[in-house]
Design a protein with these regions (language model features):
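Bacterial N-terminal signal peptides
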Residues: 9-17
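Amphipathic, heptad-repeat alpha-helical segments
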Residues: 60-103
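C-terminal amphipathic alpha-helix
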Residues: 27-68, 122-171
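N-terminal signal peptide c-region/cleavage motif recognized by signal peptidases
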Residues: 19-21
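Long, amphipathic, charge-rich alpha-helical segments that form helical bundles/coiled-coils
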Residues: 92-146
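Amphipathic, soluble alpha-helical interaction motifs
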Residues: 73, 77, 109-112, 116, ...
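Bacterial N-terminal signal peptides that target proteins for export
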Residues: 1-8
Length: 171
């Protein structure tokens, strides 16, 4: 059981270290010069956005698999072992439930973000730069939702790590 706890601690630490962060930018009106810049640089803007989309998809796959590993192989297995050994912990079980709910929220937030991002990439920024920018703001807000969910997952992982460490120290 000690080996499993050490493995769980290691995975938790990795997630905390490597979770990417995203931020939203506040809405503002575009000047005529900015509208012109978007129009003139539309193709290079789209190339950069496609790169961001590809990186985000790769990060989503990585984080999704790590979150799944934490939920199913670490939290669930630990709680099952604790119950089997007569040492059930209500706080660890609650953390598992909260983590799984937040993981589902992360998935849904990311799907919404991806859909809005795809809508952005399908827009004509050369002919409709203001509309393109408004959609970019929608994408930023959706990305902020994804980031907030990731931060909540990080907090749950940190709390669970502390609980597992306390459990280990009390054995």
């Amino acid at each position: 059981m000690q080996k499993g706890i050490k493995y769980a601690a290691f995975i938790f630490a990795l997630i905390l270290i490597f979770s990417p962060s995203a931020t939203a930018i506040d809405h503002r009106e575009l000047s005529e010069g900015e509208v012109g810049i978007i129009s003139q640089n539309c193709s290079s803007i789209k190339v950069r956005l496609q790169r961001v989309q590809k990186d985000d998809a790769r990060n989503r796959v990585f984080l999704g698999s790590q979150y799944e590993t934490i939920a199913s192989k670490l939290m669930l297995n630990l709680n099952l072992r604790l119950v089997k050994n007569g040492m059930a912990s209500a706080s660890l079980a609650e953390q598992q439930t909260t983590f799984m709910s937040e993981r589902d929220r992360f998935k849904n937030d990311f799907i919404g973000y991806s859909q809005e991002f795809e809508n952005l990439l399908n827009m004509n920024c050369k002919d409709e730069p203001e509309k393109f920018y408004r959609q970019l703001e929608v994408v930023r807000a959706k990305r902020a939702d994804v980031d907030a969910s990731m931060q909540r997952l990080k907090s749950i992982i940190s709390l669970h790590y502390e609980s597992v460490t306390d459990l280990r120290n009390n054995l």
